[in-house]
Amino acid sequence: MTAWRDTLGRIGVRAMPGAGGFWRWWQQSLLAWLPQRWQWQLGLSQSRLLLQLDGEALQLLRQRDQTSDTVASLPWPVQPQEVNALLPTALEGLPQHWLLPASHALRRPLRLPAAAAARLQDVARFEIDRQTPFTADQVYFDARVLDVREDGQLDAELVVVPRRMIDGPAGVPEAWSNALSGIDVADARGAPLGVNLLPPARRLRRSDPMQRWNLLLAVAALVLLAVAGWLLLDNRRQAADDLRAQVQANAGRARQVAAERQQLLELVEGAAFFQEQRATRPTSVEIWDELSRRLPSGTYLEKFSVEGGQLQLIGLSKEASSLVRRLEGSPLWHTPSLTGVLQSDAGRNVDRFTITAELAGPDAKEAADAAQR
């Protein structure tokens, strides 16, 4: 039995007590869909090559599951190299097992708990002293599970062959001792029991048909893992780049909004400042009203200007020399004064004047408003 099928068998015994028949039926049903050659190449077949001495001839049998077909009959003696040279290509990789006659073996039935399936060889070694007249060092042995009872116990069988029956002249020839993957025993009808009496250390390890598949699967898994990791890393890198670009775009818009907000704030503050400045200065209407009350008759203005908190009056008056005195004491301005000299206009009997004054601050404006009220 191959490693895969051994593993599946152990799982079937331990994981599903009482369902061994169903497990075997399910396996066989699945395998029936695959050609025999594929079953062997995938490591799912029980195919092996049996070698059995029959008088003066060596019978070569190919066992597949429970059936055996004669491959060749070679005159004895024959060397392993000669047999391998005669084998077809499809049979070269099959494990070779020597088949002993039923008379060489001693078989004893065993009833074991289900937990014993995991350590069947150790349990069988312990049972040798109890079930046979030999010790474990005097025999080659193996055990096989026959059935799983409804109560979970195992029906097993212990198979032992004295060492002299294998190592002696009537056993396996010395030339074949290092060329075998196992030693099996035939039952009363000549069918192999399916045991392997050869110790694991002496079994020939042929190339595992699944080794190449396992290697390819491992390489494929590594490649897929590397590709998945690279794709994940590239995806995360792309996501990071997109996030960085989005942050930069948002930062640019945020800076633009902040700049526009600052500009708007400055405009609002500037407008508020100018509004405040205008509120603290007398208006043109108020200045005109004040001038109309203070300027005497016969006075004409050619220019009226308010710039930077300074009032400038240019005009003609018959009483130009008294204008400064008349303008003094107003709550809307202070320190009125003539700029330059008076220029006489003899034809009209008036003098040209230029007067400047500083507009008053908010306190004076409030006083003027109160006086008007």
From Swiss-Prot:
Record GO cellular component, one term: plasma membrane
SUPFAM superfamilies hit by this protein: Actin-like ATPase domain
A GO BP annotation: protein transport
Periplasmic topological segments: 234-373
UniProt main location, coarse: membrane
Membrane-spanning intervals of the chain: 215-233
Pfam families associated with the record: PilN (PF05137)
Gene3D superfamilies on file: 3.30.1490.300
The entry's keywords: Cell inner membrane, Cell membrane, Membrane, Protein transport, Transmembrane, Transmembrane helix, Transport
Bilayer disposition of the protein: Single-pass membrane protein
Topological domain spans for side Cytoplasmic: 1-214
Record-linked InterPro entries: ATPase_NBD (IPR043129), Extracell_DNA_Util/SecSys_Comp (IPR052534), PilN (IPR007813)
Localization annotation: Cell inner membrane
Subunit structure, as described in the record: Type II secretion system is composed of four main components: the outer membrane complex, the inner membrane complex, the cytoplasmic secretion ATPase and the periplasm-spanning pseudopilus. Forms homodimers. Interacts with XpsM/GspM. Interacts with XpsE/GspE and XpsF/GspF.
Protein role: Inner membrane component of the type II secretion system required for the energy-dependent secretion of extracellular factors such as proteases and toxins from the periplasm. Plays a role in the complex assembly and recruits XpsM resulting in a stable complex in the inner membrane. Provides thus a link between the energy-providing XpsE protein in the cytoplasm and the rest of the T2SS machinery.
PANTHER family per record: DNA UTILIZATION PROTEIN HOFN
UniProt similarity note: Belongs to the GSP L family.
Name of the protein described by the UniProt record: Type II secretion system protein L
Organism: Xanthomonas campestris pv. campestris (strain ATCC 33913 / DSM 3586 / NCPPB 528 / LMG 568 / P 25)
Lineage of the organism: Bacteria, Pseudomonadati, Pseudomonadota, Gammaproteobacteria, Lysobacterales
